[in-house]
From Swiss-Prot:
PANTHER family: ATP SYNTHASE SUBUNIT A (PTHR11410:SF0). Its main location: membrane. Keywords: ATP synthesis, Cell inner membrane, Cell membrane, CF(0), Hydrogen ion transport, Ion transport, Membrane, Transmembrane, Transmembrane helix, Transport. InterPro entries: ATP_synth_F0_asu, ATP_synth_F0_asu_bact/mt, F0_ATP_A_sf. The lineage of its organism: Bacteria, Pseudomonadati, Pseudomonadota, Alphaproteobacteria, Sphingomonadales. It is found in: Cell inner membrane. SUPFAM superfamilies: F1F0 ATP synthase subunit A. This is ATP synthase subunit a.
Length: 261
């Protein structure tokens, strides 16, 4: 938490800071940062979660039920959006969904009381943008692999009158090209906004108790803390919803490449 003259900077939590020595790669210094650390933590946590749930038991435990619930949820979504062809892409979309979900949830851990500062990886457009570009690249590869140049027919909706094609095709093309930007931006904005609001409210709590008029400051602090509890619960919901929306839109984009709707 950054504090200057008693003020709390709500944007300090998003700063990427180096944690140790790096190495030189092609003239550029590569550093291990707090962002990289929490991506590693998310990957390890996710791996342990999946490993624990994949141990088959005659009577499934809660851990196994949770893992099977997630896999069944994504598998059903892929089948509903793409059909039987969706099974090929389920591992990718499932990995994407779980990674985003774990990154979102890890960023919500109240570790500040222990002197640790969790970093929300998905609060950076560089990370969400790369995830979106990977999904977009898969859509392009699948589209051209399956349909060749006929993939360009995606930009001319079925039944479009011939005179309207010069107008509709560019609009559809631009709409298609902005998909990775909107996909990455949506997740970035949603996660950043909630964390900024929580940090601002935490500043109200601290400064309220340090106010000269203690009774008034205490009221502000209590109200702010109550709001923090409610918004934290909402942020947990947003963490799951945003992971789902990212996975859902990815599956819909893949469906366009597979079925050329």
């Amino acid at each position: 938490m950054a504090a200057e003259s008693g003020k709390i900077d709500p944007m300090h939590q998003f700063e990427v800071t180096p944690l140790g020595g790096g190495f030189n790669l092609g003239g550029q210094e590569v550093l291990f940062t707090n962002s990289a650390l929490w991506m590693v933590v998310a990957a390890i946590t996710l791996g342990l979660f999946m490993w624990g749930g994949m141990r088959r038991q005659l009577v499934p435990g809660r851990w196994q039920v949770a893992v099977e619930g997630f896999t069944g949820f994504i598998s059903s979504m892929m089948m509903a959006n793409i059909g039987t062809e969706g099974r090929k892409y389920t591992p990718y979309v499932f990995s994407l969904f779980m990674f985003i979900l774990f990154c979102n949830l890890l960023g919500m851990l109240p570790l500040g009381v222990l002197g640790l500062h969790p970093f929300t990886v998905t609060s950076h457009i560089a990370i969400t943008g790369v995830l979106a570009l990977i999904s977009f690249a898969i859509v392009l590869v699948v589209g051209f692999w399956r349909h060749g140049l006929h993939f360009f027919s995606l930009f001319v909706p079925h039944g479009t009158p011939l005179p309207m094609i010069p107008i509709i095709a560019p609009i559809e093309f631009v709409s298609f090209m902005v998909r990775p930007f909107s996909l990455g931006l949506r997740l970035f904005v949603a996660m950043t906004a909630g964390h900024v609001l929580l940090k601002v409210l935490s500043g109200f709590v601290i400064n309220g108790f340090n106010a000269e008029t203690l009774w008034l400051g205490s009221i502000v602090s209590v109200l702010s803390f109550t709001l923090m509890i409610g918004i934290s619960a909402l942020e947990l919901l947003v963490a799951g919803i945003q992971a789902y929306v990212f996975a859902l839109l990815t599956s819909l984009y893949i469906n366009d490449a597979v079925n050329l709707h």
